[in-house]
From Swiss-Prot:
Binding partners and assembly: Homodimer. The tRNA molecule binds across the dimer.
InterPro entries found in the cross-reference section: aa-tRNA-synt_IIb (IPR002314), aa-tRNA-synth_II (IPR006195), aa-tRNA-synth_II/BPL/LPL (IPR045864), Ser-tRNA-ligase_type_1 (IPR002317), Ser-tRNA-synth_1_N (IPR015866), SerRS_1_N_sf (IPR042103), SerRS_core (IPR033729), tRNA-bd_arm (IPR010978)
Predominant location: cytoplasm
Protein name: Serine--tRNA ligase
Binding site for L-serine: T233, A234, E235, E287, S387
Task of the protein: Catalyzes the attachment of serine to tRNA(Ser). Is also able to aminoacylate tRNA(Sec) with serine, to form the misacylated tRNA L-seryl-tRNA(Sec), which will be further converted into selenocysteinyl-tRNA(Sec).
UniProt domain comment: Consists of two distinct domains, a catalytic core and a N-terminal extension that is involved in tRNA binding.
Length: 426
């Protein structure tokens, strides 16, 4: 969440910067609440001073043998007014805090200004899409040939947007996740974590999914107990490991990685990507999270993005990197790069990773801090997250880019050690 001081001192500037994201800040409402807050605070401070003076005069009057009943009545009246004033202050602050929780992060000055994904800026490309000399099949057709993808069985179990994987295709899916985890822990310096797949509301508020995006989440209601939510990404559980903590400078940067299933309702995706594994209610993802000193977060974003790119390079999958524009960035991001992998059957690049610097936005919500050795005081950390990668979409890319004319699939060289001798999926 944004620093409340920004809304008090730079409200119009904040509103202008948020407008570049397509977000309309209710300036009049915030100004009205702030004026009320100041007025009530001034009144309660004056009342407290008067009450203190009256309380002091009670002792003096008592020493002189004077009647203190009127003074006592005044003090009691002021105490009641003070309690009412503090309650009003708390209510105003709660309303301001509620507004803050719905305001997205401010984009960095380096982020391209734009309204939608059409305004994203391509930064670079890697690899060249293969020219096939036969009719390209999509991953659904390839899965039917091998028997490795079964969407009908999944629909019988769970409905639309699920998949059952079998045999070598299931093993290939597992191999991809193992390869990614081994790469990030072995070469990129991340520490592997196994975290809960269900979290409570404060964790989702900490990373920004709540309260604004509850409709995108799967919720488990429990009578008499706190509700659970299925994680939409391991970003939630990994990042919240530092919630409420004050980290030593020597602990930074923290680099965490986890392989988990992710669960999303896809509430706004009706009619999009209904065929295949591109958009599912349940999918696996390897997630990278970094917690860093504020001055190093932009450098860390470049490194995080390079870590995700390395997966695609070793798999020899063509991809491109986009700098997202202000209107297409996620709620909590200061700056985001998307990686898009080439999908032959669609003749275009599709998103496979999103790498974001969230600045102190999540840290403020979580109260995640580090002790700055220069000041000796606790300060907010910066947090970053990125997919390294979405396993299901990577499987789609491998199946389609490594397909042969007969519908068989060559296993990428880097995955062969994980495939138990299987080099071709038929």
């Amino acid at each position: 969440m944004l620093d409340s001081k920004l809304l008090r001192g730079q409200l119009q500037e904040v509103a202008d910067r948020l407008a570049s994201r397509g977000f309309s800040l209710d300036v009049a409402r915030i100004e009205s609440l702030e004026e009320r807050r100041k007025a009530v605070q001034t009144r309660t401070e004056q009342l407290q001073a008067e009450r203190n003076a009256r309380s002091k005069s009670i002792g003096q009057a008592k020493a002189k043998g004077e009647d203190i009943a009127p003074l006592m009545a005044d003090v009691e009246r002021m105490a009641n007014e003070l309690a009412a004033g503090k309650a009003e202050l708390d209510a105003i602050q709660a309303e301001l805090d509620g507004i803050l929780l719905t305001i997205p992060n401010l984009p960095d000055a380096s982020v391209p200004v734009g309204a939608s994904e059409d305004d994203n800026v391509e930064v670079r490309r890697w690899g060249t899409p293969k020219a096939f000399d036969f009719e390209i099949k999509d991953h659904v057709a390839l899965g039917e040939i091998s028997g490795g993808l079964d969407f009908e069985a999944a629909a019988k179990l769970s409905g639309a947007r699920f998949a059952v994987l079998r045999g070598p295709v299931a093993r290939l899916h597992r191999a991809l996740a193992q390869f990614m985890i081994n790469l990030h822990t072995g070469e990129h310096g991340y520490e592997e974590h196994y975290t809960p797949y269900m979290v409570q509301a404060p964790a989702l508020q900490g990373t920004g999914q709540l309260p604004k995006f509850e409709e995108d989440l799967f919720k488990i209601t429990r009578e008499g107990e706190a509700d659970f939510y299925l994680i939409p990404t391991a970003e939630v559980s990994l990042t919240n490991l530092v919630a409420g903590e004050i980290l030593d400078a020597k602990q930074l940067p923290l680099k965490l990685v986890a392989h988990t299933p992710c669960f999303r309702s896809e509430a706004g995706a009706s009619g999009r990507d209904t065929r295949g594994m591109i958009r599912q209610h349940q999918f696996d993802k390897v997630e990278m999270v970094q917690v860093v000193e504020p001055s190093k977060s932009m450098e860390a974003l470049e490194g995080l993005t390079a870590n995700a790119e390395r997966v695609l390079q070793l798999l020899e999958l063509p991809y491109r990197v986009l700098a997202l524009c202000t209107g297409d960035m996620g709620f909590g991001a200061v700056k985001t790069y998307d990686l898009e992998v080439w999908v032959p059957s669609q003749d275009k690049y599709r998103e496979i990773s999103s790498c974001s610097n969230c600045g102190d936005f999540q840290a403020r919500r979580m109260q995640a801090r580090w002790r700055n050795p220069e000041t000796g005081k606790p300060e907010l950390v910066h947090t970053l997250n990125g997919s390294g990668l979405a396993v299901g979409r990577t499987l789609v890319a491998v199946l389609e880019n490594y397909q042969q004319a007969d519908g068989s699939i060559l296993v990428p060289e880097v995955l062969k050690p994980y495939m138990g001798g299987v080099e071709v999926i038929r």
